[in-house]
Amino acid sequence: MKKRHVWAMCSVMAAFAAHGGEVLFEHGKEFKIGNRQCKEFRFVSPDPAKGRVVVDLRCRIDYPRAAGWCPCWQIEVNGKAITAAATRSETRLLNRPYYLNNKWHGRYPADNRSDKWYALYLPDFKSAERHFNPPSISEATRVALDISDLVKTDSTNTVTLRAGGVSGSFYKSQGVTDRTPGVVFGEIRIYTEKELSRIPRATEKIVRATVKNSVKTVFSVDRKSDAFNVSVSGEGTPVKSVFSVPGGGEIGLGGKDRIETPFYTVSRKVAVRSNRIDIYDTFVSKTNELIGVKIRYEIPQKGFDPVYVAGDSSPSAEEFPGGRNPSVFGVNAKGGYSMALLAQDDVFRVQNVQYCKEGFFGIRTDGLALKPGEPRTVEWSIYPVASDDYYDFVNAVRRDWDVNFPIIGSFNLSMNMFRKFSEKSAKGIVRNFGLSVNSFGCHIWSHLGGKYKEYKDVIFGMGMNSPQVRVKIDAKKSVLEDPRVVHQFKRECIANARKYTPDLKILSYIHNQISVGIDDDKYEDCRMINAKGKPMNYNGGATQKLFVPTKDNLYGRDFKKLADWYLDNFDLDGLYHDELNHCNSRIYYGDKMWDGSTVELDGNNNVKRKLSYVCLLKLDFTLDLFGHVMNKRGKLFIGNFSPETRSERKFRFPRFEETYSSRWIALSHLYTPIQLGDMLTYANTPKDMAADQRMALKRGALYYHYCGGTGCPTLSSKMFPFTPVELHGGWLVGKERILTAVSGEFGWRGESPEVDVFVFDELGREVKGYPWSRKDTANGRIFTLELKPDHCAAIVKR
């Protein structure tokens, strides 16, 4: 172990010597950070204009053997989480390429294209060497980052390391009991080099709230035979439409209304609205065989920076699949305008990939199926915006999609705690979170205590009302258990909640793809199939099978009955549905079902095989389940994952986004903008939980607590109900209240309400008597609030 330390120290010090650097900070020993914990380092920096500043460290997941990798740590410089890419053209990662070649598992990435970094499961740093080709101990566990653009010269700098997402259940299932989940960091050093940084200096943009009028954009469309241009303020932007051709090659539509290939025709209809251009491209196959087409709608990236990919402006965000936020938004700062592309119809949304790469940003599908003679219309829109504000685009889409409806809350997943809660504890969590709705989370056996405390499994799907269920005890052993003991546990929790907190709405957890029933074999034709043609289990486990429910298959019909069973057998106000869109994989690779819309194409653009998106396969089932629970049974629904289809919008209920990756928060922007509390790296301390709530506001979202508790009412206690009017990066305007993590002027256009102002400090505590002012204007009453650092506030109508 000492030799490894000496080797690592010498190798890094050799780098200092080679580059003539100065050591600003060093911590020579290994240290471990557990899940939801952090460690902070401070240093003083010279002027980075004279030489770049580098933070250099090693990391690995503390595990007794090599076992793959996961995104599980975060690094912040002066409070800003950083990624491998500094800009669209400059990397921050100095010591290695973005991907390394792992001999067993393929490409090992640096980060998750957001602010979570990968680490390897390893017993020590040296053991990584044999798993990479070529051997790369110095690279696979090492991260050297250029932070020159973020350091300050007039005050102390901080580097914060956070860990989280190392699965404790994985440790238990593999019989690892000699250590706790966490990330081990090796020698961390911060130093300068003579070489100058290529990263442009960051300029801190001070966000200040204003009472904004809706942006009115004057634009025009110029359609020539070879081009489709959209002009804002006289400056034209070309929007390209490119389609693949079976046999190889591609064809562009330009500004024409119709093109024809030997295999299909495309006819275009354009509708110019007041704030957007709606485009309808109808494809008709001319062949007697199934064919497919790749479709790209894109804008040259030159002159546009930043570019938001599915709402994420990070330079690491190159592409993102799916229909939750099927948009790209590019800012042309020089021209004073922005351009956005948006997928609209169900199929194009689900198949959609948003991207910014290779000189273009756009939206695409890689395999739209065309049956013989079948017309298929792809609907998409262009949004010209006369500002550089992404949220002006978001608010325009939200109005067009009619998704500004009342959102209930606050919501939590802590019903399983109510069996042991005292009356004081039950009322405390309701008061502190502002809870109006609470749900059971996964039905975890260990929650029951007693002999079940060491069980490593969960009851999913049909297992809940099955005579027996499969339960995994450890890595090798499973037993059969009677689920009625879980039923009794749920009833005891519900009884206490009804007694202590009678106004609290109670939901039960459901998941429509995972099941552990003893007789699940009868659903074998409904199994989820992976890319190798094999049936899938949840997270690759042994007992939890994955299925695809449809309105017509046996599993789908029985799952609808299961929803009724929950509502009939427990005193519930509704259901919480986890992972509404898909689980583990978006794509079903089997041949027993087909979504009728998706194919995989080979290198010559010929059909290789049929594929299916799970969301499309089960769409009719999903809509039927929503209607049954909400309309026929009159119950509440809350869901995980924003809608991927237009069809789902007719059912209005809260759907949040998890935060395994912080970029997922932006996926909520076009429906109910809700972040489920950080699931990986933020600790359960008052300071971190308050910071997490402020971060949600800065990313344009409301907040549902996930883990932990608060010792006092925080901002979330004043957050709901909330009917969105406008979203902004730092403050949200609702009909009932305004929530803010920034200073500025606030109000409701044309209204002069009386309000109460609640301010919360860096620990989430209310600050009584915090100063604010108001003034009446011709456009309504304006409230001015100057917040101290790390404070937030709710301005609530009386």
Predicted segments, located by residue:
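Beta-strand-rich recognition domains
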Residues: 21-206
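Polysaccharide-binding surfaces and accessory modules of carbohydrate-active proteins
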Residues: 197-241, 249-262, 266-353
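Beta-strand-rich recognition/accessory modules
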Residues: 243-248, 259-260, 273, 278, ...
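Active-site-proximal substrate-binding groove within the catalytic cores of carbohydrate-active enzymes
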Residues: 373-374, 378, 613-798
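An acidic-aromatic substrate-binding cleft motif
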Residues: 379-472, 501-502
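Active-site neighborhood of glycoside hydrolase catalytic domains
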Residues: 554-646
